[in-house]
Each structure stands twice: as C-alpha cells, then as structure tokens.
Amino acid sequence: MTKKVYFNHDGGVDDLVSLFLLLQMENVQLIGVSTIGADCYLEPSLSASVKIINRFSNEDIQVAPSYERGKNPFPKEWRMHAFFMDALPILNEPVKHVASNVSDKEAFEDIIQTLKRQSEKVTLLFTGPLTDLAKALQKDSSIVQYIEKLVWMGGTFLPKGNVEEPEHDGSAEWNAYWDPEAVKIVFDSDIEIDMVALESTNQVPLTLDVRQRWANERQYTGIDFLGVSYAAVPPLTHFITNSTYFLWDVLTAAYIGNKDLVHSIEKKVDVISYGPSQGKTFECKDGRKINVINHVDNNAFFDYITALAKKVN
C-alpha cells in the first residue's frame, strides 16, 4: 500500500540523500518537500533539492523554503555541506524533464495547504528541527486531523546527547536543541509521533567498510551518488567524536519505506525548553506517549538503502 509522505529537511548530506532514496521507494508517494536553514544554508539546500527531484524522478514537486530561525545555530562547518551537494556534477547535468522548482510559498504555508488538499491522511517526515511544523500548528491547528503520524529524527533518552556547546550540559540531540520551543509545541499537540532517536541512529555510523562497499559498486549511478555524497563527511574510524557522521536521516527515511528494519518502545515523554538542558527529551509519568525507535538491524538497513540506490542506473 502506498503512503503519502510530506518531507521537511535541513539540507545536510543525509537529508539530501534521504530525498533521493524516498524518490526510489515504490510504496511512498512524496507529495511535498520543504527545507529549513538549520544544518545547512538555505539557498544551496533549496537548489540541491530541486536538482535531486529533477535528476532522479519525474515528480512535479515544488520545494518550499523556510525562513525560520532557531535559538541555537548549527556549526558553520556542518552547514557548508549543502554547497558541496549542490555542486555535484551528477546534479548539474542537463536533464530532459524539469518539473520541480522552488515554491513561492513558505514551508509552513506549504505544509498547511498540502495537507488540506489530501483525501487521505499524510505521514510527516521531519529530519531536521520541528520549527516549521510548530509554526503550521500555531497558524492552523486543524491540520492535525490530516496527519497520520509524524516521523521525526530527533531527541534522545541516553545520558549524553550529541550537543557539545558552551552553556549546555550535553544532554540534548541537535535537532531538538536548535529549536526546543518548537519541540514543546509539537509534543503538546495530538499528533502521533515516531521518534528516531540517537539510540538507533548511533547504530548506523558511516564507516570505512560502508564507503568501500559503495566504491565497489559505483558502476550503478545511484550508488556512485551515495559514495560521492558521503565523501564530504568524516567516517567513524577509531572512536566517536563530535563530528563522526551517522546516517541519522537516512535511517529515518528508510523506516518510512520499511518499518521492519527497526524495533521501537513506547515512552511517556516531555522536553525542556529553556536553560542549560534545553532540548533535552526526558521520560515522565505525565508526559505524552511516543514510539521511540531504539534498535535497527544494521545489515538489513544498509542492504535496503543500497538496493534502493541501485534502482538508478
């Protein structure tokens, strides 16, 4: 059964690779895409998104920009990856079919209007901060009735998150930390949430073996795109650092296409919006229920995304 998916991302390598993979999923109908300048700069992310849609599909999807700003910016060095992706030769070859372009609507407007046009409920896929969804909810709370569920790459319940910034205690995950107030707004809504947390994404690091696997099969256009894209980021070699790259967003997108890759548990949770722990997601007896993806079959995951990429030859 085909599911309708709206994708909001923040332009990192794994966000843009996720867009590429979603376009190859036969059980997914991608009905909308928007991007926010969180872990990226907005203009190259917009441009790369349009190019990916036109290069790897025939979909008529207008990519909506977000002009929202978070409380805690991502490091500039991480945000530069969108420029690299936008400049890839494979995305700049002339294409015969150009259906996608930049939308004249802002992301929150595009979310509202796209949801309301549908005859069936939509799965929201967010691989960046929840800022645009929070703004959409504030503008029109009735959109909740059009949402099947939210699948979000964000948050963690581990003792240590992946934020290492001044004046923060290190307990948060970056997408939650960028705009913790947005997380609170979404958590306080009635939307069903599947959270792909660090508990599972930490199980899919980019390793030298993964890179070599893709290098060995680069005769496939899609595999070559994967390999070249991830050449921009540091792999896990000897130990995890603040810059070690995991396939955070790709795992989240893969879960949309194949839920059997993961296991989840139900938790009652909330989020801290302010102070040195801002962005920390935590369990509490009076919290809202969410499904936390806490385990992934590493081999099955990499087999799945590699098979999807091989469809483009």
Language model features: what each stretch is:
Residues 2-51, 97-195, 201, 208:
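Active-site histidine-anchored catalytic micro-motif
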Residues 46-117, 275, 284-296, 306-310:
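Metal-dependent C-N hydrolase catalytic cores
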Residues 33-35, 58-63, 90-94, 152-154, ...:
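Short, surface-exposed, polar/charged, turn-prone segments marking secondary-structure boundaries
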Residues 2, 20-30, 174-177, 185-313:
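Conformational coupling and interaction surfaces
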Residues 7-16, 69-76, 94-99, 143-150, ...:
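Phosphate-binding glycine-rich loops and adjacent basic patches that engage nucleotide phosphates
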Residues 2-10, 65-70, 90-93, 139-140, ...:
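Short, mixed-charge, low-aromatic patches
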Residues 2, 13, 91, 95, ...:
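General secondary-structure edge motif
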Residues 40-44, 72, 156-160, 271-287:
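Short, mixed-charge aromatic SLiMs
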